[in-house]
Amino acid sequence: MAELACFCYPHLENDSYKFIPFNSLAIKCMLTAKVDKKDQDKFYNSIVYGIAPPPQFKKRYNTNDNSRGMNYETPMFNKVAILICEALNSIKVTQSDVANVLSRVVSVRHLENLVLRKENHQDVLFHSKELLLKAVLIAIGQSKEIETTATAEGGEIVFQNAAFTMWKLTYLDHKLMPILDQNFIEYKITLNEDKPISDICVKELVAELRWQYNRFAVITHGKGHYRVVKYSSVANHADRVFATYKNNAKSGNVTDFNLLDQRIIWQNWYAFTSSMKQGNTLDVCKKLLFQKMKQEKNPFKGLSTDRKMDEVSHVGI
């Protein structure tokens, strides 16, 4: 995750702003500079290489002292920064909005995936600039639309029906902020269209998840798509979701947390997010993740969760 101010800076033109991407040498200069505390939140002028990000965001970049940041000297950083600027320059950002826009925290991996989709000649985003910009505006929180299959971050499609598409995420192969844990495996499920879904499509998805992904929990971060994650990573997701929800509420960026379809979401996660929305503390909410839930009646007649061991998928072992 990183603020948009880590990728670009605003230049006032008439009554709106044009956004310009940073170059890696300006960032490198800022990372070595001694800056007064009162100037930590101001864009840094490198004199030689142009404007650089505010020094308060130093930890967002990979250095000898911080290996958890972005690999800003890679070509992928430039591609992501340019893509963000193209999207922001396609809309009007006024003086009253610019600080709020640049302080927004976005998913770096999501944006790298959109670059990969843009460069894939077989992908619809390669052929449609309009759809690409729409996908980026959704990714950076500048659009209220949800991420659907056409505008999704992408990955490897492992399941699809008339209503849903399931993607295996490819973060292990990333350049900008790769996941280093070689055991990482995670999926995302997007809606093909933002419209009511038939019971038969939900039943097909639930059957696929129970047969093939029984070692994973289906959760949501509240943004209109599902995530399929290892049970061992659920607590980590809970911490992140709770922190984001509270930060958004504190900063006034209140967006409706979409609980999604209770028939698909893992029962304990649904309880956790419902409790969070009611205003309970993190400790109270997280207890629900580890509590034995009363088994609800199966909403789909004839769809059993009972399988013989040799019939059950071993994905995730």
Swiss-Prot record:
Disulfide bridge positions per record: none
Region (RNA-binding): 205-241
GO function term, MF aspect, one: ribonucleoside triphosphate phosphatase activity
A GO cellular component entry from the record: host cell cytoplasm
Entry superkingdom: Viruses
Assembly notes: Homooctamer. Interacts with VP1; this interaction is weak. Interacts with NSP5; this interaction leads to up-regulation of NSP5 phosphorylation and formation of viral factories. Interacts with host DCP1A, DCP1B, DDX6, EDC4 and EIF2S1/eIF2-alpha; these interactions are probably part of the sequestration of some host SGs and PBs proteins in viral factories.
Record-given protein name: Non-structural protein 2
Species in which this protein is naturally found: Rotavirus A (strain RVA/Human/United States/P/1974/G3P1A[8]) (RV-A)
